[in-house]
């Protein structure tokens, strides 16, 4: 098991909060991740894409600290705080609880922070509803708000738009972009919606069989042969979710061994 080590020295604003170097993960003798390098940087949205079984969720769980590594190194900045929103969240039907009470269980927020997060995530009208009655999109907003109440420096989101219609997906990604700018946190996302990935991300990592096949700015990754082999070059119609100049997508896509 590879130990987690603190990042040494004083942190600059653009220094990585988490760094993975040559990380490998195995389950039952089977290789899940191999030679993965990643830097989680404040203010950057990094999106993990790949087919089912490529290792995306395992990599996100390594970032969060829920999965141990078999090789490589994981560094974390002192006092790094991670807000994790899993893809699946089940509510015990025998334990009725309102969204307000569920959010309050985070235990970190003062009144000012509570009001700020509730306003930013638009969950005011949901607070007194039982969790069991919330839709998938509403539940994800509550989970995101609860994560933000914990003052995270890193937000880790596993398929946050899964099961949502196009309008709800667009609204959620706009919200994530706004929160990144407002709170300055790093964001690591798993997504299968390639239109939104290209519009919302600063960096895209494309995984295949547990390795990073290519990485870089979205517009350059889509031209990379490894990406096109997996997904083709066509993204489908423009969603109109973000303006085309939302990010500067210039710069080369790197092969998997490049710097994270």
UniProtKB/Swiss-Prot annotation:
Disulfide bonds: none annotated. The complex is composed of two ATP-binding proteins (ZnuC), two transmembrane proteins (ZnuB) and a solute-binding protein (ZnuA). The keyword ATP-binding applies. This is Zinc import ATP-binding protein ZnuC. Part of the ABC transporter complex ZnuABC involved in zinc import. Responsible for energy coupling to the transport system. It is a peripheral membrane protein. One of its GO terms (molecular function) is ATP binding. GO terms for cellular component: plasma membrane. It holds the Pfam family ABC_tran. Residues 241-260 are annotated as: Disordered. Gene3D superfamilies: P-loop containing nucleotide triphosphate hydrolases. Its EC number is 7.2.2.20. The keyword Cell inner membrane applies. It is an enzyme of class 7 (translocase). It catalyses: Zn(2+)(out) + ATP(in) + H2O(in) = Zn(2+)(in) + ADP(in) + phosphate(in) + H(+)(in). One of its GO terms (biological process) is response to zinc ion. Belongs to the ABC transporter superfamily. Zinc importer (TC 3.A.1.15.5) family. Coiled coil: none annotated. It is found in: Cell inner membrane. InterPro entries: AAA+_ATPase, ABC_transporter-like_ATP-bd, ABC_transporter-like_CS, Metal_Ion_Import_ABC, P-loop_NTPase. ATP binds at residues 50-57. Residues 18-234 form the ABC transporter domain. Keywords: ATP-binding, Cell inner membrane, Cell membrane, Ion transport, Membrane, Nucleotide-binding, Translocase, Transport, Zinc, Zinc transport.
């Amino acid at each position: 098991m590879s130990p987690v080590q603190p990042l040494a020295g004083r942190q600059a604003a653009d220094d990585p909060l988490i760094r993975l170097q040559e990380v490998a993960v195995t389950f039952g003798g089977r290789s899940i991740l191999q030679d993965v390098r990643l830097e989680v940087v404040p203010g950057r949205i990094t999106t993990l894409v790949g087919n089912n079984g490529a290792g995306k969720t395992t990599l996100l769980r390594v970032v969060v600290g829920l999965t141990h590594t078999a090789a490589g190194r994981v560094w974390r900045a002192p006092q790094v705080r991670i807000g994790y929103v899993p893809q699946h969240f089940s509510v015990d039907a025998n334990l009725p609880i309102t969204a307000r009470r569920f959010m309050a269980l985070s235990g970190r927020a003062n009144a000012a922070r509570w009001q700020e997060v509730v306003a930013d995530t638009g969950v005011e009208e949901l607070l007194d509803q039982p969790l069991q009655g919330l839709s998938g999109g509403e539940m994800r907003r509550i989970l995101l708000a609860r994560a933000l109440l914990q003052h995270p420096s890193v937000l880790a989101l596993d398929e946050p738009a899964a099961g949502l219609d196009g309008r709800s997906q667009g609204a959620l990604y706009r919200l994530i972009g706004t929160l990144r700018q407002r709170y300055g946190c790093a964001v690591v996302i798993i997504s299968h919606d390639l239109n939104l990935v290209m519009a919302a991300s600063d960096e895209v990592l494309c995984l295949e069989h547990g390795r990073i096949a290519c990485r870089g700015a979205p517009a350059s990754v889509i031209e990379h042969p490894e990406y096109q082999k997996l997904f083709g070059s066509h993204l489908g119609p423009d969603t109109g979710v973000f303006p085309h100049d939302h990010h500067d997508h210039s710069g080369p896509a790197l092969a998997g061994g490049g710097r994270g």
